[in-house]
Regions:
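Short glycine-aspartate micro-motif
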Residues: 86-88, 114, 172-176, 197, ...
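Active-site metal-coordination/substrate-binding segment of hydrolases
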Residues: 83-146, 155, 169, 368-369, ...
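Acidic/histidine-rich catalytic neighborhood of metal-dependent amide-processing enzymes
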Residues: 122-191, 233, 387-391
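Acidic, glycine-rich active-site loops and adjacent beta-strand->loop/helix elements
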Residues: 93-95, 148-155, 178-181, 204, ...
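Acidic/His- and Gly-rich active-site-bordering loop/insert found
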Residues: 2-117, 138, 321, 339
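Metal-dependent amide/peptide-bond hydrolase catalytic core
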Residues: 1-10, 17, 34, 61-64, ...
Length: 391
């Protein structure tokens, strides 16, 4: 068994040699469209990644989704024992950017950073995950590892959540390759979040001649969303944002329909249940006088909570970082992501193991080029150490 110092040296040699190749691979990923709602694009990127992983000797599992693009898992080092416990690497291949973005804003770079849609969130993480597996194969470290490419993380993981839960059943540990913070910090905790659709139905009428015959869904939804927004308690760690409202046909028509999109943020599962129960009560209380008020089932993210198992994995990652002269730190963030899926399932989990970057979800998104080999080093050594640590 190689010592940590010997392993680190072999890993460093690989990453330094492959840095230009990795940058080219990242550029090819960024220039492939994969907006969350563009199913064909996200599946096409999935096809490309399946080809890459198959050529590396991976075994592919693909779930055909009826709601969004397909989540995919590629497994390595498990052919002799398909049920072997393995290390999970989890990436999402969708971005927030719609089809056509790469034509007007393709991958570019300067001396320090690279730019382009999803370069940090999270195509940089995909590149690091793929090359971590290649690295381990090259240096002769036989580790059962599975890389998951989810399809819809940016819109709530409706197609991917159950897939990740299922794949986590045989997991020793899970590394989520979301970008590290701009200062290089890893992510050791995240809020949960839900997306919901509020629907109000009323009765239309002429707003002048027959105003009293109508039941306004727009007036109704105004009351309901005000009551829901008032549930927010930011110091306690939960909030309700009504981000999109629509309804009605025109100013001279009493509206018979209205709809709102709501995003909740919460720190604990108990807070999530509180918000959902209050939403239900508000809908029931306002279903009267000809109004019908309903809210959809939540689609979103479980909270990624700090716990002892996750802390131990973070300490292991810090050991890996120290081997390359890095003093890694961890932060809890408000933004939700998929790490809560494995953490809530009892799998030691850490997030932010991808490329260092910032200005996510904007046309100014960037990734730090020097962090590509740097974070590859940390991930590869962390995989080996986790495989040795967890039975």
């Amino acid at each position: 068994m190689k010592e940590v110092r010997q392993l680190a040296e072999g890993i460093r040699c690989f990453s330094e040699e492959k840095k230009p190749e990795m940058e080219n691979f990242l550029a090819s990923l960024v220039n492939r469209e994969s907006g969350s709602y563009d199913t064909e694009d996200v599946n096409a990127l999935g096809d490309f990644l399946v080809k890459v992983c198959t050529e590396m000797g991976g075994s592919v599992t693909r779930h055909r989704s009826r709601v969004h693009a397909d989540p995919i898992a590629c497994t390595f080092g498990c052919k002799d024992n398909p049920d072997a416990r393995r290390i999970l690497l989890v990436c999402h291949r969708d971005t927030v950017f719609p089809h056509g973005t790469t034509k007007t804003r393709p991958y570019t770079e300067d001396e320090k950073n690279c730019y382009g849609p999803g370069c940090a969130d999270m195509k940089g993480g995909i590149a690091i995950g793929i090359y971590a597996i290649r690295l381990l194969q090259t240096i002769g470290e036989s580790v059962p590892v599975e890389i998951i490419f989810t399809s819809d993380e940016e819109i709530g993981s409706e197609a991917s959540e159950e897939f990740v839960k299922c794949r986590a059943k045989n997991a020793k540990a899970a590394f989520f390759l979301e970008p590290a913070r701009a200062n290089g910090a890893l992510v050791t905790g995240r809020n949960g979040g839900d997306l919901l659709t509020l629907t109000v139905k009323g009765h239309s009428s002429h707003a002048g001649n027959a105003f009293e015959d109508g039941v306004s869904a727009v007036h109704g939804i105004a009351r309901v969303i005000t009551q829901m927004a008032e549930l927010s308690d930011t110091p306690a760690g939960y909030s309700t944002n009504v981000g999109l409202v629509s309804g009605g046909e025109g100013a001279i028509v009493v509206a018979d329909h209205a709809q709102a999109r709501i995003y909740t943020r919460f720190s604990t599962l108990e807070q999530r249940e509180f918000l959902l129960s209050r939403f239900k009560a508000i809908c029931e209380a306002n279903t009267q006088g000809g109004l019908k008020v309903s809210i959809s089932a939540p689609v979103g993210f479980l909270p990624f909570l700090p716990n002892e198992a996750n802390h131990q994995l973070f300490e292991l990652v810090k050991v890996a970082g120290n081997a390359f002269g890095l003093s890694l730190t961890g932060v809890n963030v408000r933004g939700a992501a998929d790490a809560g899926i494995t953490s809530c399932a009892g799998v030691p989990t850490i997030c932010g193991m991808g490329i260092v970057g910032g200005n996510l979800h904007t046309d100014r998104e960037y990734a730090v080029k020097a962090s590509l080999p740097e974070r590859l080093n940390v991930l590869a050594l962390s995989i080996v150490l986790a495989n040795r640590t967890y039975a």
